[in-house]
UniProtKB/Swiss-Prot annotation:
Gene name, Swiss-Prot/TrEMBL: csx1
Residues covered by region (Disordered): 456-476
Role according to the record: Regulates global gene expression after oxidative stress. Interacts and stabilizes atf1 and pcr1 mRNAs after oxidative stress, thus controlling their turnover.
One Pfam assignment: RRM_1
Protein name in UniProt: RNA-binding post-transcriptional regulator csx1
Lineage per the UniProt record: Eukaryota, Fungi, Dikarya, Ascomycota, Taphrinomycotina
Keywords per UniProt: Cytoplasm, Phosphoprotein, Repeat, RNA-binding
Main location: cytoplasm
Protein species of origin: Schizosaccharomyces pombe (strain 972 / ATCC 24843) (Fission yeast)
Length: 632
């Protein structure tokens, strides 16, 4: 049952019907009413699009005790022998002009004259949401009222709101004052609740309740699940605010708060700009709940043009703070912008309310977080984009959650924010160390990467330095690092290289490091006296990423002969960016020289048919942790 069914024309009323509490005789009330027959009356508007009460409506109610402050019933103009041929038509959309309304009634086989009321407070011809429709006869007007009132308008997402026009009819003058009315906001309504349901809920308790209006979405025509109820008595309005909180309407508890209506002049001015009203009553449903939630950082953006994208919204809302997520549902004409901080969302709502974005003015309100609370709290705990100062530990540099140099290169100094880890390729430490973007590339004329000092245990000859050698499932691809001269040297026959590979082996529990094992003597000259040389840097880099197979010096060499050979090693620096296959190729080229010198005897027979790396200064050879093709 619609709310308009609760009204009837005053001419149908018995003139002797007056409220029981009134002490004024019926005749005096009629005379007072008839004295103002031609006084134009304008409807009161809570929002820019709709009237809560038609100016000519009277309520048909049983006699009851009314509040002394209730406005007495008044007769309407036009009471007499002749019925009016003009109807009042309200709740018009801003785009409905006189041409549309006239064509609308013509499609219904009703020839009419239409006069759309325009705002006098604005220089532009702005619609103020109602008009007057004059029919060919009073019977035609009455037939249209009974047939089309509260039915859907063809081609629009709204219904006909019809009633008899007041005194002057087409000569109706707007913006005339009337008795004050007091509104309350009602939220948490069911989607199926209608105006009449909300009205009867309050009218059954408060006789001064004059109207109820549920707000609908202008695009979809669906209920927004909140509305406004108006009273002629301020006392009953205040009583409803206190005692109707949680009152059941169709089984749903109501949420009551004060509505702050805007003046008609202000509404007309906003309508001239195409701005949706932004009064407290409009923002009330979201502000009461969502704005009190400290974790809610999402802004609802309504009135978006269909050609706007997420990138356009980002440009408009990015100045107010860091944006976590932007979403524009397809075909809804709205969007959601989620910030990392609540203060940024508040600033955006206060600043961008009613702003022109694209070709339309937007309306803002509190929405609901599109990201889970866990993701939001994690984002708020991170460091801001402006930068931060902290010292990176070994685990942060080489751990799971940091970038693996060579797989995802980038600077890792102490003043930059951490990078996300990239997918790790199945390269070994030796191969990664030979890539141009690895740490070792610094010794080839490239920019070096400075890390904080790390002090791992001494290098073990029996331990698998790379975690990939021990069958670990960690998925890490540790990289070798060149050893700064200040941090590398022989201390009691032990070498302490500053290597990321050692740190990775320390993290991996399957690679057990023996803390006090000396390197083979044939490596000590390179790590001792000549550790500043280019060839030594290259040698130690490769040793840090390979597993020792034969730790002892050749039996064919005594100590003096070994020292003599060790004092003049082949220069392997030219191979600093070669792969293991390239090293094998160099070995084959030098085999004749090795066999002639006497300490590379039977080297060919000792090499299995796969790629190996060797150091030509001794009979030792190093087994790579993983064979690679040239293009891997």
């Amino acid at each position: 049952m619609s709310i308009d069914c609760l009204y009837r024309r005053s001419s149908l009323f018995d003139t002797s019907f007056v409220p029981l509490h009134s002490s004024i005789p019926a005749t005096s009330k009629m005379s007072a009413s008839n004295s103002d027959v031609n006084a134009p009356i304008s409807p009161v508007v809570d929002e820019g699009k709709s009237e809560l009460v038609s100016p000519t409506l009277e309520r048909l109610v049983a006699p009851f005790n009314c509040s002394p402050s209730s406005t007495p019933l008044q007769d309407v103009a036009g009471v007499g022998s002749k019925m009016s041929d003009t109807l009042w038509m309200g709740d018009l959309e801003p785009w409905m002009d006189a041409t549309f309304i006239q064509q609308l009634w013509a499609s219904l086989n009703e020839p009419v004259n239409v006069k759309v009321m325009r705002s006098k407070a604005s220089s532009s011809e702005t619609l103020i949401s109602y008009c007057f429709v004059q029919f060919s006869s009073s019977a035609a007007a009455e037939r249209a009222l009974m047939k089309y009132n509260n039915t859907m308008i063809p081609g629009a997402h709204c219904t006909f709101k019809l009633n008899w026009a007041t005194g002057g009819g087409i000569q109706h003058n707007n913006f005339v004052s009337r008795d004050p009315e007091f509104s309350i906001f009602v939220g948490d309504l069911l989607p199926t609740t209608e105006d009449s349901d909300l009205f009867m809920t309050f009218r059954s308790i408060y006789p001064s309740c004059t109207s109820a209006k549920i707000i609908v979405d202008p695009v979809t025509g669906l209920s927004r699940k909140y509305g406004f109820v108006r009273f002629s008595s301020e006392k009953e309005q205040q009583h409803a605010l206190m005692h109707m909180q949680g009152y059941l309407c169709q089984g749903r508890p109501l949420r009551i708060s004060v509505a702050s209506p805007k003046s008609r002049a202000s509404i007309a001015a906003d309508s001239a700009l195409g701005i949706v009203p932004t009064s407290t009553s409009n923002r009330q449903p979201n502000q009461d709940l969502c704005s009190m939630d400290p974790l809610n950082t999402t802004v609802f953006v309504g009135g978006l043009a269909s050609n706007l994208s997420e990138k356009d919204l980002q440009v408009c809302f990015q100045p107010f703070g860091r944006i976590l997520n932007i979403k524009i549902p397809f075909g809804k004409g709205c969007g959601f912008v989620q910030y990392s901080e609540k203060s940024a969302a508040e600033k955006a709502i206060n600043t961008m309310q009613g702003a022109l974005v694209g070709t339309s003015h937007i309306r803002l309100a509190w929405g609901h977080n599109t990201l889970p609370v866990s993701a939001l709290s994690q984002s708020q705990s991170q460091v801001s984009d402006e930068g931060f100062d902290r010292t990176l530990s070994a685990n942060q540099i080489f751990g799971m959650n940091q970038s693996v140099i060579g797989a995802n290169s980038g600077s890792s100094n102490s003043s930059g924010s951490s990078l996300k880890s990239a997918p790790v390729s199945p390269r070994t430490a030796a191969a990664q160390s030979l890539l141009p973007n690895s740490v070792v590339s610094s010794i080839n004329g490239m920019n070096s990467v400075n890390f904080s000092t790390i002090s791992p245990p001494p290098l073990s000859r029996s331990a698998s330095i790379s975690p990939t050698l021990s069958g670990s499932g960690s998925g890490l691809t540790p990289l070798s690092s060149h050893f700064p001269s200040a941090a590398t040297g022989l201390v009691g026959g032990q070498v302490y290289p500053q290597s990321s590979v050692l740190q990775s082996s320390k993290i991996n529990g399957s690679a057990k490091v023996q803390p006090s094992v000396k390197l083979p003597e044939w490596l000590q000259p390179f790590s001792g006296n000549n550790h500043n040389s280019f060839a030594t840097q290259d040698l130690l880099t490769r040793v840090s990423s390979l597993k020792l197979v034969d730790d002892e010096q050749p039996a064919s060499l005594n100590g003096s002969a070994f020292q003599a050979r060790a004092s003049r090693p082949w220069n392997l620096g030219r191979e600093r960016q070669s792969s293991l296959i390239d090293l094998r190729h160099e070995l084959e080229q030098n085999e004749n020289g090795l066999e002639k010198s006497g300490f590379g005897l039977n080297l060919r027979g000792r090499l299995p048919p796969r790629s190996y790396s060797t150091f030509n200064c001794t009979g030792q050879y190093l087994q790579p942790s993983l064979r690679l093709s040239r293009d891997s």
